[in-house]
Amino acid sequence: MDIKDEKALTIEKACTINVFAPFVRNVTAEDEKAVTNKKHINSSATVHVFHGVVNRTFKTKGNTVGLPKSFSKAVIETLSYKPFAPICIHSRSDEVVNGFPLIYFPEDLASHDISGKDWKSFIHDVNMACSFSDVALMGLDQILNLVSFGLSAYVISYYVEKYVDKAKFPIIKGFIEMWNRKFFNPRKTHVYFINSDEVAEQRAVSIKAYQQGKGTKGLFSKFNAQREWKKQHQDISSTQHSRLLLISL
């Protein structure tokens, strides 16, 4: 797909929803292990690339070649899309190359015409992109060579034209932006990628708001309030893990 066909491309605005807000539901690698009944999840780059390529279309010609199969799925215009509370999916570890948990949310996504197969394809795509997270350090020739892996030229062009020297994890953001435009947004959903630095910023904002809500003024009272906040958020307070934030529009 030629980047010139996408005239409305712009760098996605930062997410305005704080991932530490009380109405946000959190999903971690431990939830994935519980759902799959597995103690160990294979998160190697080989597995990520294999699934990412398998879920793409190569038998047809034209603009659909190399794109996820879900993109050819027609949107149901008459469907009534039910809003749902934001879902925050934590990366499997503090190393983003290990990807994100593969968990489907039928009570929310099915009502937006997003099947388990669609969601699985998306996570596999993101995880494949996570395997290439070091691409930001590559030269232009190496980036363009990624097309040989079956990656859409759309994503590579998006990186070259929109993210060079402007954002971290450009390939991951390019993949997610492609899915948002081609699949999620028409189905009244949107996914944000929030890196660990952005998580740390949101955490600081959340702690400050909590301190202000408690009416703290002195250093000692602020310290106690911060400790209370950490205790309340102990399972999700890590700033080392990146996040995917899934919201309804």
Swiss-Prot record:
Name one cellular component (GO) term: cytosol
| Keywords attached to this entry | Cytoplasm, Nucleus
The answer to whether UniProt assigns keyword Cytoplasm to this entry is yes
**Would you say which domain of life the source belongs to?**
Eukaryota
| Location(s) in or outside the cell | Cytoplasm; Nucleus
Q: Does the keyword Membrane apply?
A: no
Stated name of the protein:
Uncharacterized protein C1198.03c
Name its species. Schizosaccharomyces pombe (strain 972 / ATCC 24843)
